[in-house]
Amino acid sequence: MMFRTSLMRFAAAFFAIVFVVLVGVARSEECTRTCIAQNCDTLSIRYGKYCGIGHSGCPGEEPCDDLDACCKIHDHCVELNGMTNISCHKKFQRCVNRLSKAIKQSKNKKVGFSTKCPYSVVIPTVNQGMDIGILFSQLGNDMKTEL
């Protein structure tokens, strides 16, 4: 049992360090003024001006669409409260869920800015990324309380 606890702590520390390093590398990017659609179905997604790890619009830039607006709000929240703030991540998920409902109500007529990266691909990708972000945040926050 003690070995398992030690292994869990090591795994949590390892993943937290990897997450922090990845975010640090990604955050070194400059802000963007153009709507980008890249890697739409991977965790290295770049969507709009604000969606994607470390991907952010320049101050005063308007989001490219409704999903990008959710990402902009999330970026602002973690900037104020820290990257491991789970309430920021949950707020983002609620924003994306509202958008998903609006898309369904429009019978899929509500579309994003990109035909290359349609909402049907991008939304599941950002949801998966946020689930992973929440997991890392929980692990990181657990480690802080143990120290």
UniProtKB/Swiss-Prot annotation:
Please give the activity regulation comment for this entry: Inhibited by aristolochic acid.
A single GO CC term for this protein reads: extracellular region
Q: Which cofactor does it need?
A: Ca(2+)
Q: How is the cofactor bound?
A: Binds 1 Ca(2+) ion per subunit.
The protein's Enzyme Commission number? 3.1.1.4
Q: What is its main location?
A: secreted
Active site (catalytic residues): H74
GO process terms (BP):
arachidonate secretion; gravitropism; lipid catabolic process; phospholipid metabolic process; pollen germination; pollen tube growth; positive regulation of cell growth; response to auxin
What is the similarity comment for this entry?
Answer: Belongs to the phospholipase A2 family.
Q: What is this protein called?
A: Phospholipase A2-beta
Identify the gene encoding this protein.
PLA2-BETA
